[in-house]
Design a protein with these regions (language model features):
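Proline-anchored loop/turn motifs at beta-strand termini and strand-loop-strand connectors
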Residues: 40-59
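Residues that flank catalytic or metal-binding motifs in active/ligand-binding sites
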Residues: 47, 167, 192
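Conserved polar/disulfide-associated segments of primarily extracytoplasmic proteins
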Residues: 58-176, 183
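Secretory targeting and sorting signals
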Residues: 1-28
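Surface-exposed amphipathic alpha-helical segments
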Residues: 51, 173-199
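Cleaved targeting-peptide boundary
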Residues: 27-37
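Residue-level detector of beta-strand structural context in well-folded domains
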Residues: 34-36, 43, 169
Length: 199
């Protein structure tokens, strides 16, 4: 029993070391391999092969990382719910990135709408208030720094009672006109962006 415990601990440490030193290798072991996705302005991300990429419009690219009940339906889009994913948005999406569809400004957060929006986590709830939780510069591949903002947000019911919390993370590259937006706190995304390439 003791020998099995030691072996399990050693195996766990080996996996941890591989994850910390080689994110791409960690993705491969989890999903059976990786693939490269070429996006705007030469930005290329290495992602697990199990992830789907919806590229119907180059300014609204969605990388689906898990369950997505709206995929393949007419509800699929930026204002849907329950779709584990992140977005890579371009100039057309940025032109309507704020309330009342004004141009995006990173200090306010991306939220194109003129009315109450559906909560990204549940179609039974609505977006509530959000507050800035973190900001700074983050590496997105060699030679590129993104203007990073993390917003602590809520989802509320019809009586405006808070029912759940989520974070909206944004990496904005103003020169390339690219915004990476994540509402699911995907644990691998920061490393994927840091290890991005530009061609």
């Amino acid at each position: 029993m003791f020998r099995k415990t030691i072996s399990a601990a050693a195996a766990g440490l080996a996996v941890l070391a591989a994850t910390l030193t080689a994110p791409a290798a960690a993705f491969a072991s989890e999903s059976g391999g990786t693939k490269q996705v070429r996006l705007r302005s030469g930005l290329t991300l290495t992602i697990p092969t199990s992830w789907k990429v919806a590229k119907d419009d180059k300014d609204w690219v969605r990388v689906i990382t898990g369950s997505c009940p709206t995929y393949g339906t007419e509800d699929f889009g930026f204002r849907d719910w329950g779709c584990h994913s992140f977005w890579v948005l371009g100039p057309k999406a940025l032109k309507i990135g704020l309330r009342t569809f004004q141009a995006y400004k990173s200090k306010y957060g991306y939220d194109p709408a003129t009315d109450v929006s559906i909560c990204p986590k549940s179609y039974k709830l609505y977006k509530g208030e959000w507050k800035l939780a973190d900001k700074g510069l983050r590496q997105v591949g060699p030679g590129h720094k993104a203007d990073y903002h993390k917003w602590a947000a809520t989802c509320v019911d019809k009586k405006w009672r808070v029912k759940l919390h989520y974070n909206q993370r944004e990496w904005y590259l103003p020169t390339s006109k690219i915004l990476v937006l994540d509402q699911w706190d995907h644990p691998q995304l920061s490393a994927i962006l840091k290890n991005a390439t530009w061609n």
